[in-house]
């Protein structure tokens, strides 16, 4: 990711997420740990909405092996948040999901980060598994051209 703040136009899938009173910390803004919850929610919702992930029975699941978040501007309850999602890279067994967090109707990201998932067999949760065709197809829709 570049060091510049991304804009909404850089993302392909969007999920509105309300902030909650409990998200604020003693400093009056959303605590950093909450951003990772938003990242996870955006990725999971995309996978469910795309028809790839059925949580109780999916034979292939993604495990987070890397995360990062860069913060540019504060967010606080009762702000409205929109998570933007795009596929940064799809390898043989892994995907880099890139997420932008947008405050209210602002065009510049308040935070940006990524998750890297390695896809594994659900039963062993150890054996890396090639990305299924259905996942590759879904990722094509959120991969910038």
Question: Model regions: which residues?
Answer:
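Catalytic strand-loop segment that frames the active site of acyl-thioester-processing enzymes
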Residues: 1-49
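HotDog/MaoC-like acyl-thioester-processing domains
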Residues: 1-13, 75-77, 88-145
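Hydrophobic beta-strand-centered segment that forms part of the acyl-chain substrate-binding groove
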Residues: 46-95, 109-110
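Hydrophobic residues in beta-strands and at strand termini
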Residues: 17-21, 71, 119
